[in-house]
């Protein structure tokens, strides 16, 4: 939806990419900027992030930004194990990466709220929360890579 300017894309390809297999954009880092985001949307995102940190991923400040760069052979294994197809699919990928010991690096971005977003605040929040529980259940007995 172009909520991040395309000219920021080169920042995802970092010099240490040999030891970083996933680079994600974050709206929560100190130098990040959010432009035009309504308070209710921001609140919804922060509440969801608290749930993500409690149920799935502790060390990532913004799993839902949408800008992610995947490199390395091991990343293919993550997508083979992925089962969630909704908005929480990337939380599942990051959850699996964390369990596999794959390094995830967050970078600050300038992010623009797009009113044309397809997110339905109430329904999608409930579905994404349900997906967090599904992620935990689906991968409860997975072995590490």
Predicted regions and their residues:
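Catalytic donor-sugar/metal-binding loop of nucleotide-sugar-dependent glycosyltransferases
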Residues: 58-59, 81-85, 94-112
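A generic signature of intrinsically disordered, low-complexity regions enriched in glycine/proline
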Residues: 5, 53, 66, 94-96, ...
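DNA-recognition element of transcription regulators
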Residues: 91
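The conserved acidic donor/metal-binding loop of glycosyltransferases
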Residues: 1-3
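Acceptor/aglycone-binding surface of glycosyltransferases and processive sugar-polymer synthases
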Residues: 5-87, 114-123, 130
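C-terminal catalytic/acceptor-binding lobe
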Residues: 100-145
């Amino acid at each position: 939806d172009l909520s991040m300017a395309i000219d920021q894309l080169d920042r995802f390809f970092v010099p240490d990419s040999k030891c970083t297999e996933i680079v994600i954009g974050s709206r929560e880092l100190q130098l990040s900027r959010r432009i035009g985001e309504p308070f209710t949307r921001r609140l919804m995102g922060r509440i969801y992030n608290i749930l993500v940190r409690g149920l799935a991923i502790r060390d990532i400040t913004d799993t839902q930004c949408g800008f992610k760069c995947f490199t390395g052979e091991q990343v293919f294994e993550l997508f083979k194990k992925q089962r969630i197809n909704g908005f929480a699919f990337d939380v599942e990928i990051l959850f699996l990466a964390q369990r596999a010991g794959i390094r995830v690096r967050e970078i600050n971005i300038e992010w623009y709220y797009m009113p044309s977003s397809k997110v339905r605040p109430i329904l999608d929040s409930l579905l994404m929360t349900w997906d967090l529980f599904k992620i935990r259940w689906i991968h409860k007995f997975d072995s590490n890579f």
